[in-house]
A protein has these predicted regions:
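Residue-identity detector for glycine
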Residues: 6-7, 32
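Residue-level detector of intrinsically disordered terminal segments
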Residues: 8-10, 44
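Charged/polar low-complexity intrinsically disordered segments
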Residues: 13-14, 23-25, 39
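Leucine-biased recognition of intrinsically disordered, low-complexity hydrophobic segments
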Residues: 17-18, 28, 33, 38
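Protein-protein interaction/assembly regions in multi-subunit complexes
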Residues: 43-235, 240-307, 316
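Extended C-terminal regions of large enzymes
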Residues: 195, 202-206, 210-232, 238-484
Length: 484
């Protein structure tokens, strides 16, 4: 995607076709409704049930608790409320993988709307096993509106089950289910199996794959097999509690302040977003533009330009080669996710989620790999195992750089790694998701691996982390040098 003469800001606005005045009106609309709620009924918050569901896995019990009005007024949104719970209820020095750590799933008022872009978002908040500090991550799917329909604004899970278990939350409360038949299944298989058990394909479930079960520090949480709360290791926390999945289905309607006005505004947003040319091809459509403005990492943050490679893995070629179809979340016209259907070189079929921009950045430009088939296979391995692709790709880039700097031998890695080599990607991603071989070096994350590999020298070879976690695919320093 060429960068227009107006520069970065113009490119962003043109890419999403969301004029500044419309964004301002949207903000005023929501803030206006919020103020209206406070002025009209200080004791009642529209869009909320003022209820959380607290689950004790150790004792297999649950209870509904009231949420204080002042908390809802102060903390508009699921993430903020989850942060408050974690701060107040979790000891500062708690082991993230101990029963004393809590994992909180929360939604905001917008999830009460029947028809509104963005209401598929849910947040997970816990103490991260990767960073050792607070984490929040967000996913999508129909799970968030269903939690609201079940009568809850948040779900707080504490303790640890003696045996693998999964939860089914509905209008009547919480059911504890034996997860023996689910343990060991990948994230896609788990989602399908739960639908089969409950006899309803509409039911969404958050679940972990095998990586979460072995408490891999970069294990993610999957929703319905196609959306991921990827960062921070939330899947490892679920695994530490022997919690395989949380399914939810509800039929209750949470009151909102102005249902008619909300529906009207949602339709206007849909019309505007449907006109956006980039929504037709999802997040891969930004690959070439991000590389051109210097925002995409190249060669594990050491490279500068990769024009041809970005064009090779970005759209429109991405759409054509991978036989792409949109995979939108509930009530969202943007359609970030892509569904792919391809026949691999070995004759096997690969059908499922296609790699999005962050994955193209970490496993494509970040490793200088322009092979869409290899990137798609690696993406599928991570998705099914339940692993964050950003961290996994960063691990591979780091290992390759350490090998080139003679900090680690090919024998220890299990192969001779190279940038631009699809085989390096496929070999190492398999080791990383399983914590096997060289993958076991990352049992404490990339910083721990750096210390194991080269001590101080290993740490010096370790760029671009924050609080022990790898950065997203946005190279600010490179962008500034390109713009300058």
């Amino acid at each position: 995607m060429p960068c227009p003469s107006g520069g970065h800001k113009q490119w962003v606005e043109e890419a999403i076709l969301l004029p500044a005045e419309f964004a301002k009106e949207t903000a005023l609309f929501f803030s206006g409704l919020y103020v209206q709620r406070l002025q009209e009924r200080s004791f009642f918050m529209y869009g909320y049930w003022s209820k959380l569901c607290r689950v004790d896995l150790t004792n297999k019990t649950w209870k509904a608790e009231d949420i204080k009005d002042e908390d809802l007024k102060l903390l508009l949104g699921g993430t903020a409320f989850g942060c408050k719970i974690l701060l107040e209820e979790t000891p500062a020095k708690v082991d993230p993988l101990s029963p004393e750590n809590k994992i909180i799933f929360a939604v905001g008022p917008i999830q009460a709307a029947k028809f509104f872009p963005g209401n598929a978002k849910w947040s997970v908040i816990t103490k991260s096993p990767l960073t050792g500090t607070f984490m929040d991550s967000a996913g999508t799917g129909a799970w968030a509106p269903q939690l609201k329909k079940a009568g809850f604004d948040a779900l707080v899970i504490e303790g640890k089950s003696e045996k693998p278990v999964w939860l089914y939350i509905n209008d009547n409360g919480v059911e504890f289910k034996d997860a023996a038949d689910l343990w060991g299944l990948d994230s896609v298989e788990t989602s399908a199996k739960i639908k089969e058990i409950l006899g309803d394909k509409r039911i969404n479930a958050l679940n972990i794959g095998p990586a979460g079960e072995i408490m891999n520090p970069i294990a993610n949480i999957t929703c319905d097999g196609h959306s991921f709360a990827g960062r921070g290791g939330g899947g490892a926390v679920m695994g530490s509690k022997n919690l395989k999945a949380v399914a939810v289905w509800g039929t209750k309607e949470c009151p909102i302040a102005d249902a008619e006005g909300c529906d009207k505004w949602a339709k206007e947003m849909f019309q505007i977003l449907h006109k956006a040319t980039e929504t037709a091809e999802g997040t891969p459509s930004v690959m070439t533009g991000m590389e051109e403005i210097g925002d995409s990492p190249i060669r594990y943050w050491r490279g500068d330009v990769w024009h041809k490679g970005a064009e090779t893995i970005g759209t429109p070629r991405y759409t054509q080669v991978l036989n792409v179809k949109p995979l939108p979340c509930q009530n969202c016209p943007v359609g970030c996710h892509r569904h792919i259907d391809i026949t691999l070189k070995n004759g096997e079929k690969l059908v499922g989620n296609g790699p999005e921009y962050e994955t193209l950045g970490t496993m494509g430009s970040g490793l200088c790999i322009d092979d869409l088939e290899a990137i798609s296979i690696a993406n599928d391995i991570c998705n099914r195992a339940g692993v964050d692709t950003i961290s996994a790709g960063s691990y591979i880039g780091f290992l390759t750089e350490c090998y080139e700097a003679s900090l680690i031998s090919a024998d220890k890695i299990g192969m001779v790694p190279h940038f631009g080599d699809p085989e390096t990607l496929l070999f190492l991603v398999d080791k990383i998701v399983k914590n096997e071989g060289i993958g076991a070096y990352f049992k404490d994350g990339i910083r721990g691996a750096a210390e194991l590999i080269g001590g101080d020298a290993g740490l010096e070879a370790l760029p671009r982390i924050a609080s022990r976690q790898e950065l997203v695919r946005a190279d600010l320093s490179r962008r500034l040098s390109v713009i300058a």
